[in-house]
Amino acid sequence: MTKTDPAPMAPPPRGEEEEEEEEDEPVPEAPSPTQERRQKPVVHPSAPAPLPKDYAFTFFDPNDPACQEILFDPQTTIPELFAIVRQWVPQVQHKIDVIGNEILRRGCHVNDRDGLTDMTLLHYACKAGAHGVGDPAAAVRLSQQLLALGADVTLRSRWTNMNALHYAAYFDVPDLVRVLLKGARPRVVNSTCSDFNHGSALHIAASSLCLGAAKCLLEHGANPALRNRKGQVPAEVVPDPMDMSLDKAEAALVAKELRTLLEEAVPLSCALPKVTLPNYDNVPGNLMLSALGLRLGDRVLLDGQKTGTLRFCGTTEFASGQWVGVELDEPEGKNDGSVGGVRYFICPPKQGLFASVSKISKAVDAPPSSVTSTPRTPRMDFSRVTGKGRREHKGKKKTPSSPSLGSLQQRDGAKAEVGDQVLVAGQKQGIVRFYGKTDFAPGYWYGIELDQPTGKHDGSVFGVRYFTCPPRHGVFAPASRIQRIGGSTDSPGDSVGAKKVHQVTMTQPKRTFTTVRTPKDIASENSISRLLFCCWFPWMLRAEMQS
């Protein structure tokens, strides 16, 4: 369905920081193409986009012969051409230079505004440089033509309070940033925008993960220590990689690179914590833990509130410095042990959390009431249990028997042996099939065959088989997550034990993605996701900017 523009609305009053400019004069219709260009800019009234009769599509396609007739027809008015430019589709945005030239041929002043969006041709040109939807080359051609005719870089849209440089930074078009700043006044590069907490173009590029635009702005003298209304420098508005979903691996890498770039650009005199803090990147994680009296597998307290098990300590790809990875007892975390496509440890979803080393402390767990710490006893007959926690076999010694292949050696902290019935996380019942070290995480792990198909695998993880069970019946758990509820279900003659295929020590995080795309590809995705920014109605434009 073809969307049409609503009745013209008066744009909001100008903000305090908008540059002084000549008064715009409303004009009812566009002048004839043969008329000379006006001396003063005007605001053109809103009009619907023209379409050919019996046209099959809902958008204007400049490549279609019928649409070309309308585009080059002298009777097509400037407001109608502005309505075409507003359509956020590749067919239109790739021809921004052609459409813009037609607008100029009709006598349009270089600083004329679209009455619906309050945007000038230069604003539209910068928006049309977005990768994926627009064409940077076509946008640069039109921008150079407009600047040569005297287009004002400082003009702002009264709906978004953004100038042309802000649009170029938001849509990550470094070529346009260079064109706009060439010959512009020095204060333009650090001009702020109220819709981005009075941040500069560098703040806008940082918050939108526009690495190319940020580099270009720094090359042209953008101030990396300028603070917005919240007191943040550009490095502090870069999205946190740990808050990104697992399918945003490339974006997390861009966020890390962008933050590092902006931090290194900040002068040392600026009181930015990340710059002034010492760098522990080269300190091994085990030394850091030893200094704190901790080791992997210890129970820890995070921020004095959340308890969990320490699973990782070391440097990461998502941020500089030393980080600890904790498997929380409850699903109150943010990940499953991986961030930005890089796996550091394994835990159930929403139970993994990364934090700085200073935020953890050793937790003292109360001894569990249902599991005692006494040595393992022979298989129990529950018919002879006389009371809670009291059994008639007390004091009896375990009768030696020939161990099966699946039996375990006595280890500190072991609560069950192969063949024992256990309860996992207080919910799932199963039988222990494996106990020992694994390749996928440090420490000792129990491999359990669950009674119901609520597991995650068939006894193998990352190509290493630890035991055999039906698909989706296998699960691994640390000792703190299991509780023995019965004796062994295997007879002494059982010959199937869990045999590990091979032993390797995992020293590097394992990536869960195979390809890394360029920042330009990422910018394309970001541009596609910004369609709402350029929707048809100005109140939706403003809502997008405020979000």
Swiss-Prot record:
Limits of the CAP-Gly domain: 314-356, 436-478
Coiled-coil stretches: none
Sequence segments annotated as region (Disordered): 1-49, 365-413
GO biological process: cytoplasmic microtubule organization; fat cell differentiation; membrane biogenesis; negative regulation of microtubule polymerization; peptidyl-L-cysteine S-palmitoylation; positive regulation of apoptotic process; positive regulation of D-glucose transmembrane transport; positive regulation of endocytosis
The ANK repeat ranges on this chain: 117-158, 160-191, 197-229
Modification note: Palmitoylation by ZDHHC17 regulates association with the plasma membrane.
InterPro entries xrefs: Ankyrin_rpt (IPR002110), Ankyrin_rpt-contain_sf (IPR036770), CAP-Gly_dom_sf (IPR036859), CAP-Gly_domain (IPR000938)
Chief site of localization: membrane
Sequence positions bearing Phosphoserine: S401
Domain remarks in the Swiss-Prot or TrEMBL record: Microtubule association is inhibited by the ANK repeats and the Golgi localization region (GoLD).
Note: The N-terminal half is dispensable for proper Golgi targeting, whereas the GoLD region is required.
Subunit field text: Homodimer. Interacts with AKT1 and AKT2; when AKT1 and AKT2 are phosphorylated and activated, affinity is higher for AKT2. Interacts with ZDHHC13 (via ANK repeats). Interacts with ZDHHC17 (via ANK repeats).
Protein name (Swiss-Prot/TrEMBL): CAP-Gly domain-containing linker protein 3
Species of provenance: Homo sapiens
Source lineage: Eukaryota, Metazoa, Chordata, Craniata, Vertebrata
Gene: CLIP3
